[in-house]
């Protein structure tokens, strides 16, 4: 800024100390800096400071608070990431604790930008007070401020966390929403390393979370289960829950749901919790906590709409791994009955359930995600998945049934059906079924069908897979390979335009 602008800002700054009507002065400062180059404005603001602007927030008349925030925001925008906190540390501390929402939001945004850009911009020894102040804001009544505080306190350097975790205890004295915010920070920190998890345990947070599952607040319980499920996928997390007896206590709570008038609302959360663990440790969960499997299969068999979508997702998540498939088949008839029920749901349910059931089936049939590249598929899995697929329609031909579903014009159903078809075509027996069913190859190769982009890409991937198959004759393989070469979005119009452009 020119020396004239610098002097002008000094005059405005001085007037803020003496004038009673500060609104015109704040507007003048706003106009002065609004369009000034950042480099020039930064020098002036660094030299003169912002103390008098900040002081405008500390007067009895609060009518100018919003305008003061606007002015401070313009001033802060002239600085690089992290520089505002470095240049005006004491002011940021004051702003973080201000009673006005817009003021706290302004301050926490500056800390947020610094931490997200580069956590090392604010070294812990110098700025620990800032981090402590932000940690206390996870209880903030302004949801936006609280959410930013959660992100900041979850992404600091290691040496900040002992103090941050200590501060989270403040939230435990507040309402369930604030406690959930604190728990989220605790879990985010615990997932970073065993040492930090141990620190969370020593502070009593994990035990407190498990005990809070006895609350009558349904949403609160579900949030805790969601957070604990994230922790349980870590070996040290699940080991603690088992050794501490927490998993046993959570299992007992499932048994009590039938006597709880709100049990129907809670059951989906408990199923998701145990499914997240069973995805990684199916054998141990099936053996030690059979009540989970019983609840899962009962939920599928009952067809209860409040829990069925979650149950389908859970079964698919468990069965997507090879170990999960083998453990499920070892369960015997309850699982077979569940498979048959899912086949019925695919054939006869409304769109939402049909789609969830198709994706569940696809996860159970698929082997690609859990099989080494080009490696052989366990022959037991080949036999199991073939039998499971037949349950799609035992009274008719399962592959003809799938072809019919693939032809349904609704995009979401079609995409889910293609997901199942792709899973089926990961097996030799699946390729053979495609080759056997009249009209299936023609349907796949028909580019005249009006399909959304995602469906065209999904069908293209299936054809690309089948183009490497050994079960089709040379003519069909040639057509498959031509389709692959032309790409998923080729059409006669594309060819016509290309020819016209070449003339």
Specify the residue positions occupied by each region the protein language model found:
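Eukaryotic tandem repeat interaction scaffolds
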Residues: 246, 252-413
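Short, hydrophobic/charged alpha-helical patches characteristic of ARM/HEAT alpha-solenoid repeats
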Residues: 3-4, 39-48, 79-87, 120-128, ...
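Residue-level detector of extended alpha-helical repeat arrays and alpha-solenoid scaffolds
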Residues: 22-25, 65, 104-105, 146, ...
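N-terminal "cap/leader" segments of large eukaryotic alpha-helical scaffolds
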Residues: 1-58, 165, 491-503
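Hydrophobic residues within the alpha-helices of tandem HEAT/HEAT-like
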Residues: 29-36, 68-77, 110-118, 152-158, ...
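HEAT/HEAT-like alpha-solenoid repeats
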Residues: 10-18, 50-58, 62, 89-97, ...
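Alpha-solenoid helical repeat scaffolds
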Residues: 70-71, 79-81, 109-110, 152-153, ...
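Solenoidal tandem-repeat scaffolds enriched in leucines and small polar residues
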Residues: 101, 111-294, 304, 311, ...
């Amino acid at each position: 800024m020119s020396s004239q602008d610098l002097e002008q800002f000094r005059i405005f700054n001085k007037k803020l100390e003496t004038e009673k009507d500060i609104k015109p002065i704040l507007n003048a400062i706003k106009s002065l800096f609004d369009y000034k180059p950042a480099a020039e404005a930064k020098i002036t603001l660094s030299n003169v400071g912002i103390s008098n602007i900040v002081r405008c927030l500390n007067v009895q008349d609060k009518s100018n608070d919003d305008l003061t925030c606007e002015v401070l925001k313009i001033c802060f925008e002239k600085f690089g990431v992290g520089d505002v906190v470095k240049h005006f540390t004491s002011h940021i501390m004051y702003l973080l604790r201000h009673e006005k929402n817009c003021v706290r939001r302004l301050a926490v945004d500056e800390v947020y930008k610094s931490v997200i850009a580069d956590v090392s911009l604010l070294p812990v020894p110098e700025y620990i007070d800032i981090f402590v102040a932000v940690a206390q804001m996870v209880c903030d009544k302004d949801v936006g401020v609280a959410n930013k505080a959660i992100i900041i306190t979850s992404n600091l350097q290691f040496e900040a966390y002992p103090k941050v975790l200590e501060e989270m205890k403040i939230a435990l004295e507040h309402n369930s929403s604030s406690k959930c915010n604190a728990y989220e920070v605790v879990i985010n920190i615990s997932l970073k390393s065993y040492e930090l998890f141990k620190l969370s345990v020593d502070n009593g947070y994990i035990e407190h979370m498990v005990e809070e599952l006895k609350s009558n607040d349904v949403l609160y319980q579900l949030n805790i289960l969601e957070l604990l499920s994230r922790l349980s996928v870590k070996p040290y997390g699940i080991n603690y829950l088992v050794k501490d007896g927490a998993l046993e206590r959570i299992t007992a709570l499932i048994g009590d749901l039938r006597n709880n008038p709100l049990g129907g609302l809670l059951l989906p959360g408990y199923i998701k919790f145990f499914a997240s663990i069973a995805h990684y440790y199916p054998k141990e969960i099936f053996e030690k906590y059979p009540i989970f499997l019983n609840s899962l299969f009962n939920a599928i068999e009952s067809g209860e709409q409040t829990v069925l979508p979650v149950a389908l997702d859970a079964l698919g998540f468990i069965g997507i791994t090879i170990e999960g498939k083998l453990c499920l088949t070892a369960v015997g008839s309850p699982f077979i009955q569940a498979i048959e029920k899912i086949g019925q749901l695919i054939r006869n349910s409304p769109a939402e359930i049909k789609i969830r059931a198709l994706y569940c089936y696809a996860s159970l049939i698929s082997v690609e995600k859990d099989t080494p590249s080009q490696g052989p598929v366990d022959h037991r899995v080949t036999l199991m998945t073939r039998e499971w697929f037949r349950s799609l329609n035992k009274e008719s031909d399962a592959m003809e049934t799938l072809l019919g579903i693939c032809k349904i014009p609704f995009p979401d159903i079609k995409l889910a059906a293609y997901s199942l078809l792709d899973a089926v075509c990961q097996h030799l027996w699946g390729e053979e079924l495609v080759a056997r069913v009249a009209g299936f190859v023609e349907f796949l190769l028909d580019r005249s069908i009006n399909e959304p982009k995602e469906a065209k890409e999904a069908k293209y991937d299936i054809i690309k897979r089948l183009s490497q198959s050994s079960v089709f004759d040379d003519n069909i393989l040639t057509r498959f390979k031509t389709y692959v070469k032309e790409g998923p979005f080729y059409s006669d119009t594309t060819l016509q335009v290309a020819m016209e452009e070449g003339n």
